[in-house]
Amino acid sequence: MNGKYEQQGLYRSEYEHDACGVGMVANLSGEANHDIVEKGMTILKRLMHRGATGNDPETGDGAGLLMRIPHGFFKKVLAAKNAKSESFGVAMLFGGEGEEKKIENVIKSEGCEVLGWRDVPVNPDAIGHDARAVMPKIRQLFIATKNTENTKNIENKELCDLCDLCGKNPEASFERRLYIIRREIEKATKDTYVCSCSSRTIVYKGLLLATQLEKFYPDLSDPDFISPFAIVHQRYSTNTFPTWELAHPFRAIAHNGEINAIKGNLTALAAREASLESPTFGDDLKKILPIVHGGQSDSASLDNIFELLVAAGRDAPHAMMMLVPHSPFPNSEGTISVKSPVTGIWFSLTHRR
């Protein structure tokens, strides 16, 4: 008896490591329904063994879901506020009390309109004492572009690259504007954390256990809260202290962390920021710098950079291969050739001026 399970399916004993719990469920037809949201929460609960708690057993290191925005659900919310818009983005905010005017000024300066604020319904009694003691105010801010022709029926359009250099993808222009708005809010305020700010996706997360998420956020139990996919994450905090902000998913990724070369990567990034150029962002590029700010986890930093690459026009697989290049197998001499397709891309990226 060696204590190991036999190889079966995708299971390999040599890949056993401590790790956060990450999962995803999606409807391959692209149809949004509430069943997908429920299955996402079921996956999350089955990843409890991948999470952790501190001294308070009811306060988890973090749990959350990343989903497609349920436009029908939020249109009901807007109708109740006498605000109407066929297309809009939603910013999910932690904190920001007393900074509403600054936030609204940022939105207006980017040519967008504030449709209204919403206090997200929450149940503090469903979470632990420690999490409740540091719980931020949780709100949603609804944002519309003043150019309605550019964003008609966003929720019905097929997801595509964010690049619209050809001028045929105005949806991407609005999505990129929301990205710029988020970055400017982060710089203009001290106590506001933006979980997500998008016309496509939304994040519900917190300093929670997987079993608490649905109870804490009643929105997730509403039959009209639908999505074609759900990305879930149960956090096991190792190299950063657990906080509401550092719970996953982030705006674009849910990640295991433990990036050993993070300091070197961030130093190299900071050294090259001054030479960055982008035909997609143009003069707006300076609004989103620095790309990564201090005090984040390694996964949060990766999310910042991945988000920028996709917003600049690269597709998600391309951006991820740039950031986490595949490790090629050694050749017959036991060395890795820099002429291989993967390492060739990597060396050209890291050594190009």
Region annotations inferred by a language model:
Residues 1-353:
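Conserved short alpha-helical segments that host acidic/polar catalytic motifs at enzyme active sites
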